[in-house]
């Protein structure tokens, strides 16, 4: 975005941004205040504990183990603006040495009063053994005081550390979980397990707390509106691969340390693999332009409504009203299947395969969490693979790979590495050009017209020059195509000088006959009810709303970055 246009955005959205920011920050600020209060409470408790220890030691009535300082240490994790995503704070554990118990019956009576008949049978069984056991870990202040006031020599306490997740569900798939031994078992917690145990300062991520909150809020809303089984969205800088937001729903509360076996809770950005449909037509056309086989104005004649491909395989046009003569640009705008197949045949298998590999679609991405899927292997010479891949069928990939591919195609043709870790990089010196000059400029112009003239008009948010491509695909279950849909919209903005890629995916959506669509192009046009269960009426609508909300923040907070 040029400096002049950036200033226009700032002027147009300053008041709106301040209002939205204050409104959406309420929940975030409340969480922060609650978290700070909790940490203060813990610190106060530790101080009180030390006073109790002094008194107890003077009386000789309790035994206290040495304080644990580094045993369970893990570094904090913060977002790009210093907000805590994970925090390690002091806590305390209380245990019993059965061999030191003088009056077991009296001790059980006192503990029964404190715990109100809960866990007493477990405590009784443990007391009949000689081995030390923990009565309770991460004891609350009031409970700790009650236990220490018993003055029983068999009861001892030890300082410990507790891992808190103040944002609860917000970053669950990214941060991941730890086990009871304080070892990472998923997400960032696992991938950087050793580093988190050693570094002194916090681990800084590329994520933005406020943007993550807003995107998740909209995904939850549209998931409900279109009765989707799940949803996902990723916002990434197309020039350096920094991920500002990565949301996958449903999610979970990290503080509960639940074992989740439900496949519906997978990370849909990195772990789920999908046939994504017509978003692949962008790759087919970019491949042809990169090979100098076609240009946006190249015209294809005699485009039939269906073509034969191999034995008993027919490829049909999704729209019977599709014109028989289209330019390459029109094929993308109107999302033509047959036109895309004709382009792919001109490119050929080897060249198109190499192109998809170059932009990161065919290989597993080296990423900052372990939950990343490898794309399904493809036999390019079996049946009609080249033809179906041309319009996004017969090939599975992750949302993360899709975001990377769109970034390379639109950022001038430079390779990028998606990342969650904030680094100090000399971006220009490390960028590697992988596409020919001029490819991005031509593609960006066409992607913009998909939004202004084609299937993504609902994402035409004023002031942000959004470009993109829709994709509607039948979901594959046990190698069989079902009636459920995967609706995806890959968008780039601002298209004249691309900075962000936003991919929104809604899984297994349904039409909503009552929903009111409001076009964002300034026309004021409204429409009631979903005409079709396609990406243009589901994921595009969600993406348009997301850009409308986060746009002012991006235009102000990151204008110079």
Residue ranges of predicted features:
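Beta-lactam-recognizing serine transpeptidase/beta-lactamase-like catalytic domain environment
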Residues: 6-7, 13-17, 84-86, 233, ...
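Periplasmic/cell-envelope proteins involved in peptidoglycan metabolism and beta-lactam response
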Residues: 1-257, 350-362, 480, 514-561
């Amino acid at each position: 975005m040029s400096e002049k246009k950036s200033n226009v955005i700032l002027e147009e959205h300053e008041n709106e941004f301040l209002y939205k920011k204050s409104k959406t920050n309420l929940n975030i600020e409340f969480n922060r205040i609650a978290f700070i209060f909790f940490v203060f409470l813990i610190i106060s408790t530790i101080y009180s504990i030390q006073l109790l220890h002094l008194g107890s030691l003077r009386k000789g009535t309790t035994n206290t183990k040495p304080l644990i300082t580094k045993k369970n240490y893990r570094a904090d994790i913060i977002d790009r603006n210093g907000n805590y995503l994970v925090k390690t704070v002091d806590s305390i554990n209380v245990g019993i040495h059965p061999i030191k118990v003088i009056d077991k019956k009296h001790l059980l009576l006192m503990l029964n009063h404190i715990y109100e008949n809960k866990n007493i049978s477990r405590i009784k069984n443990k007391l009949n053994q000689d081995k030390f056991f923990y009565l309770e870990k991460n004891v609350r202040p009031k409970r700790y005081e009650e236990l220490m006031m018993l003055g029983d020599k068999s009861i001892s306490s030890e300082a410990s550390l507790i891992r808190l997740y103040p944002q609860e569900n917000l970053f669950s798939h990214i941060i991941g979980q730890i086990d009871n031994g304080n070892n990472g078992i998923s997400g960032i917690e696992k991938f950087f397990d050793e580093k988190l145990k050693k570094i002194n300062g916090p681990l800084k991520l590329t994520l933005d707390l406020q943007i993550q909150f807003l995107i998740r809020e909209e995904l939850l809303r549209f998931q409900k509106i279109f009765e989707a089984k799940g949803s996902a969205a990723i916002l990434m800088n197309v020039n350096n691969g920094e991920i500002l937001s990565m949301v996958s729903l449903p999610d979970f509360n990290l503080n509960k340390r639940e074992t989740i076996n439900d496949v519906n809770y997978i990370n849909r950005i990195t772990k789920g693999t999908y046939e994504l449909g017509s978003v692949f037509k962008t790759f087919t056309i970019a491949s042809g332009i990169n090979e100098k086989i076609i240009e946006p104005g190249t015209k294809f004649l005699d485009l039939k409504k269906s073509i034969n491909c191999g034995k008993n395989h027919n490829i049909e046009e999704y729209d019977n009203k599709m014109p028989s003569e289209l330019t390459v640009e029109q094929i993308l705008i109107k999302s033509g299947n047959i036109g895309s197949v004709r382009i792919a045949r001109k490119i050929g298998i080897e060249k198109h395969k190499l192109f998809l590999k170059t932009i990161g679609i065919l290989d597993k991405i080296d990423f900052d969490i372990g939950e990343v899927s490898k794309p399904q292997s493809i036999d390019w010479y079996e049946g009609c693979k080249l033809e179906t891949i041309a319009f996004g069928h017969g090939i599975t990939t992750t949302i993360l790979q899709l975001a990377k591919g769109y970034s390379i195609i639109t950022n001038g043709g430079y390779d990028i590495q998606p990342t969650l870790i904030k680094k100090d990089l000399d971006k220009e010196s490390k960028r590697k050009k992988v596409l020919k000059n001029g490819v991005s400029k031509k593609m960006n112009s066409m992607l913009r017209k998909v939004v202004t003239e084609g299937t993504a008009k609902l994402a035409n948010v004023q002031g942000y020059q959004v470009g993109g491509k829709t994709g509607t695909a039948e979901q594959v279950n046990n190698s069989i195509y079902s009636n459920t849909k995967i609706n995806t919209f890959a968008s780039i903005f601002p298209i004249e000088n691309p900075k962000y890629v936003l991919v929104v995916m809604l899984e297994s959506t349904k039409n909503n006959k009552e929903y009111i669509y409001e076009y964002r192009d300034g026309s004021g046009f409204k429409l009631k009810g979903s005409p079709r269960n396609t990406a243009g009426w589901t994921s595009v609508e969600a993406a348009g709303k997301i850009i409308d909300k986060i746009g002012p923040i991006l235009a102000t907070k990151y204008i110079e970055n």
